[in-house]
């Protein structure tokens, strides 16, 4: 669904929820703490697709299917962020979060185009395209991958008992970053939702890699760093995987990303 008139959202402020309780500095020797069997090197760089979708949007199911295809690629992290912007049409999205809607508005404001619609895929935090158009997503992946070449930051994370450990590398020579945000997202890998009212009434919609919570857990200034999260502070019953994003500002290019399904 598209708005007939695009309007910029109000200024959005995202706060780090109880940041002091969620994370604390890790020792400088964190790289030596990797459990046996885990490769101590950083994983290959990943491209990130964020699909903003809604159960109240009759043009969204094809996009949900397209995202599932991209999620199978080893060099792509594809996540679904259900939004609540169409809840007033008769069906309240059972997976939607107002934080996801805020994130979509923040992207529109950062890009300066005011484009807020569903289904929309934001590619590497830089370009917004129609989520049903696989060719447009492919083109945006190529453009943003090239734009970020040489500028990406190695990042990884792993679980150790009741702790989640995150580690980043240094910025490449010649690049100067300030106030990059480290996001931690908990993910449900799959959900099937029967729709009882609204434009998709009678359908059962399938979703892939649904973000159930996304929190800013730290900031990065271009230097290698590590931090630890209390696992119990962010665990949810439906959590099956997790994603860490390193993003310029809070809605800029995504310069680092990592995924794990071990939860």
Regions inferred by a protein language model and the residue ranges of each:
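Bacterial N-terminal signal peptides that target proteins for export
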Residues: 2-16
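Intrinsically disordered, low-complexity segments enriched in proline/serine/threonine
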Residues: 12, 27-29, 63, 218
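Short loop/turn motifs at secondary-structure junctions
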Residues: 13-16, 117, 240
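Bacterial N-terminal signal peptides
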Residues: 13-25
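Active-site-proximal cofactor/substrate-binding loop regions of enzyme domains
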Residues: 29-117
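Short loop/turn motifs enriched for small/polar and acidic residues
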Residues: 81-84, 124, 160
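Short, conserved sequence motifs used for protein processing/export or organelle targeting and
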Residues: 94-114, 126-263
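Ligand-binding face of N-terminal immunoglobulin V-set domains in extracellular IgSF glycoproteins
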Residues: 121
């Amino acid at each position: 669904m598209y708005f007939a008139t695009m309007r910029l959202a109000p200024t959005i402020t995202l706060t780090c929820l109880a940041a002091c309780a969620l994370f604390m500095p890790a020792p400088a020797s964190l790289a030596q703490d990797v459990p046996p069997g885990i490769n101590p090197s950083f994983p290959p760089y990943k491209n990130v697709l964020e699909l903003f979708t809604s159960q109240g949007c009759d043009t969204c199911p094809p996009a949900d299917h397209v995202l599932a295809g991209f999620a199978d690629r080893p060099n792509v992290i594809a996540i679904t962020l259900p939004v609540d912007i169409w809840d007033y049409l008769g069906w309240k999205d059972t997976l939607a979060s107002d934080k996801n809607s805020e994130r979509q508005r923040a992207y529109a404001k950062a890009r300066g185009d005011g484009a807020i619609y569903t289904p929309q895929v934001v590619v590497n935090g830089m370009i917004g395209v129609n989520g049903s158009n696989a060719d447009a997503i492919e083109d945006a992946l190529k453009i943003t991958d090239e734009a970020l070449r040489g500028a990406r930051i190695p990042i990884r994370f792993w679980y150790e008992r009741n702790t989640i450990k995150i580690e980043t590398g240094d910025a490449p020579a010649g690049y100067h970053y300030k106030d990059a945000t480290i996001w931690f997202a908990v993910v449900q890998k799959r959900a099937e939702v029967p729709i009882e009212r609204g434009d998709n009434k009678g359908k059962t919609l399938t979703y892939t890699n649904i973000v159930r919570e996304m929190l800013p857990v730290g900031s990065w200034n271009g230097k290698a760093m590590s931090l630890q999260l209390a696992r119990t502070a962010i665990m949810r019953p439906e959590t099956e995987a997790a994603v860490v994003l390193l993003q310029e500002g809070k809605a800029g290019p995504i310069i680092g990303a990592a995924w794990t399904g071990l939860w």
